[in-house]
C-alpha cells in the first residue's frame, strides 16, 4: 500500500468520525433493511471468482452489524438469498448456499445477535433448514440486535404465505368465511407476515447503485425511506453507513401524508 492510499484511508476515517460525532441518536432508524447487492460485480472488478465475491460479501456482515450496535439500531433485516436466486446456475448456487449457511452459523455462534429467519424454509436444503432452526433456538434469549436473515425470500411470496397462514388459523379456530372477511384488515395480515409483530423498516439501504427494491419487504416498506449507495456490498464502509444514517436523519418522514 502506497502513501496516497494510506492518506486516503486516514482522511476517510477522520471524516467518518466527524459524521458520527454529529449524529443524533434519537434520529437513528430502529429497523434497517439491507439489500446487499454487488458481490459478483465486485468480484469481476477485482479479478476474483464469483464465489470469492460472495465470500467477501459474507465477511462484511458482522462488521456491518457491529456498526449497527454502535449506533443503537434495534432490528436489521439482511437479504441474503431471494427466491429468484434459485434460478442461478448450480455451479454458483451450490457454493453460495454453503457460504450463507456459514453466515447463519457464525452469527449464532457469535452470541451478540438474535437470529430470525424470514423466507420460505421448504425451498431450502435440509442442511440450511437445520442451521436456521438451530440459530433461532440458540439465540432466542440473546439481548442484542434482532437480525432477520432473509433466505429463500420473496416479497410477493411472503404476502401469499401470510394470507395462507391467516386462512389456516381461521379454519383451526372455526371462523366462518363471512366472519373472517369482516375481520380482515392490514393489522391482521401484518401479524401473519414473516416479521410478525416487529416494527417495519425505517430505512432500506441498497448497495451497488441499483435503484429498485426487487420485491424486498413489499408490505413492510410502505412508509420506509430508501438510500441507494453506489458502492458494491463487499466494499461498503462505515463511512457509507454513517452517510446513510445522516441522510435518513435529515429527511422529513411523511407516512403518506
Swiss-Prot record:
Cofactor binding summary note: Binds 2 magnesium ions per subunit.
Q: Does the keyword Magnesium apply?
A: yes
Task: Please name the top-level EC class of this enzyme.
Answer: transferase
> What Gene Ontology molecular-function terms does this entry list?
ditrans,polycis-polyprenyl diphosphate synthase [(2E,6E)-farnesyl diphosphate specific] activity; magnesium ion binding; Z-farnesyl diphosphate synthase activity
Identify which cofactors the protein needs according to its UniProt entry.
Mg(2+)
Q: This protein's superkingdom?
A: Bacteria
Q: Which residues bind substrate?
A: 38-42, 54, 82-84, 86, 88, 206, 212-214
NADP is among the record's keywords: no
Q: Which UniProt keywords apply?
A: Magnesium, Metal-binding, Transferase
- BP term (GO), one: polyprenol biosynthetic process
One family name in Pfam for this protein: Prenyltransf
One GO cellular component this record assigns the protein to is: plasma membrane
The UniProt record lists the EC number as 2.5.1.-
| Active site (catalytic residues) | 37, 85 (proton acceptor)
Positions with a binding annotation for Mg(2+): 37, 225
- Database matches in InterPro entries: UPP_synth-like, UPP_synth-like_CS, UPP_synth-like_sf
Name the job this protein performs. Answer: Catalyzes the condensation of isopentenyl diphosphate (IPP) with allylic pyrophosphates generating different type of terpenoids.
Give the quaternary structure: Homodimer.
Q: Which family, according to the similarity comment?
A: Belongs to the UPP synthase family.
This chain's protein is named Isoprenyl transferase 1
Organism annotation: Streptomyces avermitilis (strain ATCC 31267 / DSM 46492 / JCM 5070 / NBRC 14893 / NCIMB 12804 / NRRL 8165 / MA-4680)
What lineage is this protein's organism placed in? Bacteria, Bacillati, Actinomycetota, Actinomycetes, Kitasatosporales
Amino acid at each position: 500500500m502506497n502513501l496516497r492510499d494510506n492518506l486516503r484511508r486516514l482522511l476517510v476515517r477522520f471524516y467518518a468520525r466527524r459524521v458520527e460525532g454529529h449524529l443524533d441518536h434519537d434520529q437513528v432508524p430502529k429497523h434497517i433493511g439491507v439489500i446487499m447487492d454487488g458481490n459478483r460485480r465486485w468480484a469481476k472488478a477485482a479479478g476474483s471468482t464469483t464465489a470469492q465475491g460472495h465470500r467477501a460479501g459474507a465477511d462484511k456482515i458482522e462488521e456491518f452489524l457491529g456498526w449497527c450496535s454502535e449506533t443503537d439500531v434495534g432490528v436489521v433485516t439482511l437479504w441474503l438469498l431471494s427466491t429468484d436466486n434459485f434460478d442461478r446456475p448450480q455451479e454458483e448456487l451450490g457454493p453460495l448456499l454453503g457460504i450463507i449457511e456459514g453466515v447463519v452459523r457464525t452469527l449464532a455462534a457469535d452470541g451478540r445477535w438474535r437470529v430470525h429467519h424470514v423466507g420460505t424454509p421448504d425451498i431450502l436444503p435440509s442442511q440450511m433448514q437445520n442451521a436456521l432452526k438451530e440459530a433461532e433456538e440458540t439465540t432466542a434469549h440473546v439481548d442484542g440486535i434482532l437480525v432477520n436473515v432473509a433466505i429463500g425470500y420473496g416479497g410477493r411470496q411472503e404476502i401469499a404465505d401470510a394470507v395462507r397462514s391467516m386462512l389456516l388459523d381461521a379454519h383451526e379456530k372455526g371462523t366462518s368465511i363471512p366472519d373472517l372477511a369482516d375481520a380482515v384488515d392490514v393489522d391482521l395480515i401484518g401479524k401473519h407476515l414473516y416479521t410478525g409483530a416487529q416494527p417495519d423498516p425505517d430505512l432500506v439501504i441498497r448497495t451497488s447503485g441499483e435503484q429498485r427494491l426487487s420485491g424486498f419487504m413489499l408490505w413492510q416498506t410502505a412508509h420506509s425511506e430508501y438510500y441507494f449507495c453506489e458502492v458494491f456490498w463487499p466494499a461498503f464502509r462505515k463511512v457509507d453507513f454513517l452517510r446513510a444514517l445522516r441522510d435518513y436523519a435529515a429527511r422529513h418522514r411523511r407516512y403518506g401524508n
